[in-house]
Amino acid sequence: FTGSKEKITNRNYVFGEHNSHGPNRKEHYPSRMIFDGRYYYIQNLMHEKEYELPADLKEEKGWGNKSYQATLDAKDTHPTEYNLLKQLESGRPFEELYDMKNDPGQLYNLAGKEHLIEKQNELKKALENWREQTNDLVNDPLEIKTRQIKKQ
């Protein structure tokens, strides 16, 4: 992705999107992102909505996933992991900006920092252009037009 392979010419960015972890409406949490090789910019399109971790991460039943509870139980011995989990559960801002060279773990949101406003605006504009070009015009996954299969 950003390794030693030759750079593809005439491409300055990688774009991505996420709409939902699962079909359950409460798991819809769309975001769009752009990466220029160093800075990773994210827009959380429904940031005002309460963010809920996907059920298969939080609930042990059905999936046998014990990592959520284990992280809570290890609060004193693994405070970094515990704080990250709590940060995830507290919701996300509309904009996030990370310096992947200096913060590959994406721990420090730099969105709005004065020294990076120009970079943030560059990425924001490029992301907006990409969304227009790909006809990605809605923020709520329920409003995305999908093909309907007609019963015969």
What positions do the PLM features span?
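Long, internal low-complexity/basic segments
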Residues: K75-E95, M100-Q152
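C-terminal cap/loop subdomain of S1 sulfatases and analogous C-terminal strand-loop tails that border
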Residues: F1-E96, K151
